[in-house]
Amino acid sequence: MSIKPPSALSELVEALRALPGVGPKSAQRIAYHLMQHDREGAERLGRSLLFATEHLRHCEKCNTFTEAQVCEVCSDPERDPALLCVVETPADQIMLEQTMTYRGLYFVLMGRLSPLDGIGPKEIHFDRLVRRASDGIVKEVVLATNFTNEGEATAHYLGQTLKARGLAVTRLARGVPVGGELEYVDAGTIARAMLDRRTL
């Protein structure tokens, strides 16, 4: 007869498996480590997760994570409201900010088109983006989706729709490698891609 782990431990392993890049073995190792060697760390992690879920929300304007109704970037009067950069995730937005080359505003899709995974325009907040870009203030939309198949398809779809509304649409230059995700690219490469962006 095989011994099963306690249900509380099994639930922890399953919860960890839901994280990107964490498979069953990694989830099991993390769970056992936390319970055997780092109970204090486990409690801190639990408190931090609970605090984040209770206090983080989406910015009313750009859809990124914030603790206020409107995020710090959207509230900054020094930003250029005529320039709107579209990114897939808040992590991509942070990478672009670290380049210190972009002074416009953002819209965070919270994903990318992936019909096979059931992610269509609604799931990436397409209608909100169109409303934001069509506010009469935005003049150029910079598509900074990743250079993956889904990211390229998302950029193409967004570009066609936004150009039809009379907006100038540009795309990051190819300093970012094909298949690359902004979150993992160095700031210098992203800065060059932003400066060399091309018209679609």
UniProtKB/Swiss-Prot annotation:
Residues 82-177 form the Toprim domain. InterPro entries: DNA_Rcmb_RecR (IPR000093), Rcmb_RecR (IPR023627), Rcmb_RecR_Znf (IPR015967), TOPRIM_dom (IPR006171), TOPRIM_RecR (IPR034137). Keywords: DNA damage, DNA recombination, DNA repair, Metal-binding, Zinc, Zinc-finger. CDD domains: TOPRIM_recR. Signal peptide: none annotated. Pfam families: RecR_C, RecR_HhH, RecR_ZnF, Toprim_4. It comes from the Bacteria. The keyword Transcription regulation does not apply. SUPFAM superfamilies: Recombination protein RecR. One of its GO terms (biological process) is DNA repair. GO terms for molecular function: DNA binding; zinc ion binding. A zinc finger (C4-type) spans 59-74. HAMAP family: RecR (MF_00017). Belongs to the RecR family. May play a role in DNA repair. It seems to be involved in an RecBC-independent recombinational process of DNA repair. It may act with RecF and RecO. This is Recombination protein RecR.
